[in-house]
């Protein structure tokens, strides 16, 4: 007895980049985001936009392309953990947002290239609107911001704290004008741990690491 085998071919239509689908249904939150106008470009730019403008542009890119390689492929400015308050300071009159952009290529060893991209940083002050230049080092962007918004911070005496999460030891003669909300502090560090940390100052500003008092 012979059996007839019928092969059925199903043609799948490619989902639209502009109308993402989740389980064959449109994500209403994505649709609402797509309806909002954006002002920042969906790529790297040297022009200064606000962190909120960059954030909306990143959300648009995520919806159109999904999350796969968003930073390496788009090269857009973004703030890691923007929605959760990471890489930000919120105290005082000069709250900040640290933005970064990955302009590096995706070539891996042993492939060679002549790309000149790098991991770049710039700082936005949401208080006075100051935007730093573009830097290849995070600390350099932070220091430019501090020089503009907290002029004189480099001359502050260093302070210490008891343990990683213990109380800060602020000398009795520490300048009172620098004991205000949002002010940065300087702390002595080891050579491999000099990153300036946002929000870790006892006043809510930057904890700027230094190797010398």
Q: What does each of the following model-derived ranges do?
A:
Residues 1-8:
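Short, Lys/Arg-enriched N-terminal segments with co-localized hydrophobic residues
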Residues 8-9, 15-16, 20-22, 30-34, ...:
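Helix-coil modules at protein/domain termini and other flexible surface or pore-lining loops
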Residues 21-91:
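Negatively charged, low-complexity tracts enriched in Asp/Glu with abundant Ser/Thr
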Residues 64, 85, 111-113, 131-134, ...:
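Secreted/processed peptides and extracellular or luminal domains of membrane proteins
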Residues 67-101, 122, 154-213:
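Intrinsically disordered, low-complexity, charge-dense segments enriched in Lys/Arg
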Residues 78, 83-86, 132-137, 141:
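Extended, solvent-exposed polar beta/coil surface segments
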Residues 136-160:
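C-terminal recognition-helix end and immediately following basic linker
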